[in-house]
Structures are given as structure tokens and as C-alpha cells.
């Protein structure tokens, strides 16, 4: 047990989509994170090690349809498979496994939304884009080849025209740059920190955070 006054250490993997089976890339990420978590525990840190499953998105909905299952039943099945992968890999038994359909996650997301809205960081506007379901990203005409995404040529590009909520990401550009300057060791290694700073300096763009469909 860590001492009550021990330093806290938080580490999380990305949360894999459950639209397909786990693969070697997931195993590598889980194992790397577990190694770091175990090492920090040995150093006396109070470690919170997090992983889980991202269960929202058009890809997952369509995959559930393909298999003739209700979306919730589909994600329940694949989340269980993902937990079995963690067990098979010998990942730390105290890892926190969060699902984006968990009530505690939903409640936290709602509270975060309300906080952002209260502070003026959420607004509505019309949203008209070309969207690749495979990438789950907006695509410009210059990124398409024969009106198709080069990475997912068998998937039809969807034209979305609807009113969406947007997050005012642009409001944080100067605040982040100032924070980075005042906290030069916030991200390690340095070359990754430089990539982050360069990204912010290029200009942050507001982005959609909702879907009607």
C-alpha cells in the first residue's frame, strides 16, 4: 500500500474502439502502460492505471447492424473480449477498466459539457462537410481520390449538413502556449513537447462535438 502522502501518478492507454477484435498493437500499448504503472508503484507512487473501451461512433453502430445485434449487446460482447485480452496478457489486476457507456462516464461527460457551456466554450452552428466513416474524420476535396478516401476506397463518403454543437478550441491557443512556456517539463520527451507546441502555434480550430444522426 502506498503511503498517504505519496505522490500520485496517472497513466492511461487510449480506449480502443470495439468495432473489431483486439490486435497486436493493442497488446503492445497495454503492456507498455502496465510496465510503467508497475515501475511507478515500485518507486512508491500511488498509481491510477486506466484503460477501457470506446463504445460510441458510427462505425460501431454499423458493425452491430452487420452482425444483426443491438448496439448495446454488441459492445457488451466486445468489451468482455477486451477484458479477456487484458487477463491473458497478465495486465495488472487493479487496472481501471472504463467503458464510455458506463453510467459514471456518461455522468462525468455531462458535467464536463455543462461546465464548458457555462464558461462560453460551446456554441451552435451549421455543419456541412464530407465525412469518412472509416477514418471518422472530415475530408477536404484535396484528400479524396475519385470522390473516395484513399484509405477506405470501399466506403462511401457521407455528406453531412446539420446544425451541430461546437467546442471553442481556438479560445485556448494563447493560454496553452503561455502554460507551455511556464512549464517546460510538462511533456517528456522534449521532441514530443515540441510537436505539441508546433501544432498549437499553427492555430487551433473549433470542432464539432455532436451529431444529429
Region roles according to the model:
Residues 2-51, 99, 104-108, 158-213:
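Structured secondary-structure scaffolds
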Residues 41, 87, 117:
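Anion (oxyanion) recognition and catalysis
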Residues 46, 70, 92, 122:
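Residue-level detector of anion-binding/catalytic polar loops
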Residues 53-59:
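Short, charge-patterned binding micro-sites
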Residues 75-94:
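A glycine-rich helix N-cap at a beta->alpha junction
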Residues 101-121, 131:
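Feature captures the FAD/FMN-dependent oxidoreductase FAD-binding
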Residues 119-173, 177:
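Cys/His-rich short segments
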Amino acid at each position: 500500500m502506498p503511503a498517504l502522502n505519496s505522490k500520485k501518478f496517472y497513466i492511461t492507454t487510449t480506449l480502443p474502439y470495439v468495432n473489431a477484435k483486439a490486435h497486436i498493437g493493442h497488446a503492445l500499448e497495454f503492456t507498455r502502460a502496465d510496465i510503467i504503472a508497475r515501475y511507478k508503484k515500485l518507486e512508491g507512487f500511488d498509481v491510477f492505471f486506466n484503460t477501457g473501451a470506446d463504445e460510441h461512433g458510427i462505425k460501431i453502430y454499423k458493425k452491430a447492424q452487420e452482425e444483426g445485434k443491438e448496439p448495446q449487446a454488441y459492445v457488451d460482447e466486445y468489451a468482455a473480449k477486451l477484458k479477456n485480452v487484458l487477463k491473458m496478457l497478465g495486465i495488472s489486476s487493479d487496472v481501471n477498466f472504463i467503458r464510455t457507456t458506463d453510467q459514471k462516464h456518461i455522468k462525468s461527460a455531462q458535467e464536463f459539457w455543462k461546465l464548458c457551456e457555462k464558461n462560453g466554450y460551446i456554441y451552435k452552428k451549421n455543419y456541412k462537410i464530407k465525412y469518412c466513416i472509416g477514418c471518422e474524420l472530415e475530408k477536404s476535396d484535396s484528400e479524396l481520390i475519385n470522390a473516395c478516401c484513399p484509405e477506405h476506397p470501399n466506403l462511401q463518403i457521407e455528406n453531412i449538413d446539420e446544425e451541430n454543437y461546437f467546442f471553442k478550441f481556438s479560445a485556448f491557443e494563447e493560454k496553452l502556449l503561455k502554460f507551455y512556456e511556464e512549464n517546460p517539463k510538462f511533456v517528456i520527451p522534449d521532441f514530443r513537447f515540441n510537436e505539441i507546441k508546433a501544432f498549437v502555434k499553427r492555430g487551433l480550430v473549433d470542432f464539432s462535438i455532436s451529431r444529429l444522426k
